[in-house]
């Protein structure tokens, strides 16, 4: 059990579990909403124009809307839950706080750049050593990146700008703090990283080394969070890491 838990609201592993379940449920609900609207639209079009519905397959635009709505819904849940259940912890920088505050030393941002570089090099080496089969990369991210037009632009913006903000706040911020208020920092960091890896599974099933890549990134981001008592360096590192795969040749 952690001996550094600070006084504050009741916010521990149980609340972290509810936070995680709500996050997943909101994401699924946002996804389903997009597909329901698409299906209803197809049904109405079929009735109004008197043609058989057939077996339509949702395209990249539907997947893009599903991804966007899922992201928005899960981010809204995260914001509302923390505001209701753990607001006093928001700007506390210790392991038992959420860490939405600047680091105490500017060197934290230099460390963030180093973390992004190490994670990017590791990912590149894994790709060189165990090249992925493009035919097996059929996760949502891969499908959207191969689509033309706004679906590709949308997923790029979400991956580069949205994910570093929301995922750091969720995993290295709120969830880590909830666990660290009862458990040790190593255990909390390990569990947080495993959950982080698991939630990236849909895009990694076609290339198993991808799980190692995400795991290394998650572990490094936890180290940044604990060392500098702030989420902000991790957000920078996450942004740089994701950007490297979208904007570097």
Label the model's feature ranges.
Residues 1-102, 106, 128-129, 243-249:
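N-terminal, membrane-interfacial amphipathic/helix-forming hydrophobic leader that caps
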Residues 9, 13, 52-56, 82, ...:
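Generic preference for well-ordered secondary structure
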Residues 21-30, 107-127, 158-163:
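Alpha-helical transmembrane segments of multi-pass integral membrane proteins
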Residues 64-67, 101-117, 144-155:
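Alpha-helical membrane-spanning segments of integral membrane proteins, especially the hydrophobic core
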Residues 117-121, 129-249:
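Transmembrane helix-loop-helix hairpins at the membrane interface
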